[in-house]
A protein has these predicted regions:
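Phosphate/ribose-recognition catalytic cores of enzymes acting on nucleotide-derived substrates
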Residues: 92-168
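Nucleotidyltransferase catalytic core that binds NTPs
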Residues: 1-104, 113-115, 144
């Protein structure tokens, strides 16, 4: 499709961050002259990542599902505050999710954002912290991307870098 349409830019949501990483890699490997722009996750007022799957949740499950965003925000804060041990961050996130009786973790992982290879330490490359959790029979995903080399101010500008807060 990129060969047929030949766009200057293509926009992909960060919510499916693995797809975003694969598309970026493909564009780079195949030397397409396309800027792939990651669009930030859109969240409901209570923090839950917007998804068509949210409609499958009962009111009780919907409340239980908030453990995902609580875990994401807690992990993100730990990393922003300087924690670089992936296991420490992941264990804290898992504890938040496991405290919710209706939640069943499929996975919670931290990987190198470019290669999708699991990491033990956050060093100089962007990392993706992604999760999939069942709430009842509904599988929900959420994530955050952290780029240690990003010095953004936290203001959202067009383009969005890996951290989701500044231009690429």
């Amino acid at each position: 499709l990129f060969n047929i349409v030949t766009p200057d830019r293509a926009y992909f949501g960060q919510k499916d961050a693995q797809q975003l990483a694969v598309i970026r890699r493909m564009v780079r490997d195949l030397n397409f002259g396309i800027q792939i722009v990651g669009c930030p996750i859109i969240r409901e007022e209570d923090g839950l990542a917007k998804s068509s799957r949210n409609t499958y949740l009962s009111d009780e499950e919907r409340q239980a599902a908030l453990c995902l965003s609580r875990a994401v925000f807690a992990g993100q804060k730990m990393v922003q505050d300087g924690e670089r041990d992936a296991k420490v961050v992941l264990d804290a996130m898992k504890a938040i999710i496991e405290a919710e009786p209706m939640a069943k973790i499929d996975y919670v992982k931290m990987v190198d954002f470019e290669n999708i290879v699991q990491v033990e330490k956050i060093e100089s490359e962007p990392v993706l912290c992604a999760m999939a959790v069942y709430i009842g029979k509904t599988r929900l995903i959420d994530n955050f991307i952290f780029d240690p080399s990003c010095n953004c101010s936290g203001s959202e500008a067009e383009g969005h870098c890996c951290c989701g807060h500044c231009s690429e």
